[in-house]
Amino acid sequence: MIHSSMNKYIYTLLIVSFSFAIQIPLNVDTNWEALETNAIVIQWQRYDGFPFCKATKIISSTMEELIQLLEDKENYYKIFERIEYSKLLTSEIVHIKLDMPFPFSGRDYIVKYTKSNIKNDFIYSFEATAEIAVSIDDDYVRLVNASGGWILHPIDDETTELTYMWNGELLGDFPDWALTRAWIEQGNEVMTWIEDALE
C-alpha cells in the first residue's frame, strides 16, 4: 500500500515537472518574424508564452570546431564579452552572470545543457534548472525561465550554418519597448564573438 502510494506520488511529481517545462521552438520553421536580414538573420516569435529569438549565420568553420567551442562552458566569459562569470556546477549545469548596459542591473541564470542529433544537425539546448541551488545576488536579476539552444547544420566540410536561439525575456526593470533592440544587439554580438573566438 505504501509502495503504491509512493509510486503515485512520484508519478504526480513527474507529470507536474514536465507540465511546467518550457517548450523551446528548436525545430519550428514557421511563424518567425524578421527583425534583421543581413549576414546575420535575426527573428523572433512568441512561443509557449515566451518571446523566443534566433540568430542565424553561415560560419566558415567545421561543426567539430564549433562544438568544441560551445561545449567549453566554463570559459564562456572568455568568448562572449557580455558574460562576466561562468562556473560549472556539474559537467552540464552552469551558472552564468551577464553584464547589462547602464542603468540596468545585471542578469544571471543557472541552466542545464543537453545534446541531441537530428539527421545531420547537432543541437545543444539549455534550460533553467533548480537541481542545484545558487544564492541570489542582489546586484543581478535571476532569469528563471532562461532557455534556448545552438543548432549546427553542416553546409560542407568547412562551413556550418549556426543558429543561436534564446528566450528573450529579460525581467526586472527592463522596458518592453526596448526588447526588440536588445534582441537584435544580442544576436549580432553573439555571432560576432563566436567568429572572433574561432580566428
Q: Model-found features: residue ranges?
A:
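N-terminal leader/targeting segments
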Residues: 1-2, 16-17, 56
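Positively charged n-region of N-terminal signal peptides that target proteins for export
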Residues: 1-9
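Sec-dependent N-terminal signal peptides
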Residues: 9-21
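Eukaryotic helix-grip
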Residues: 22-199
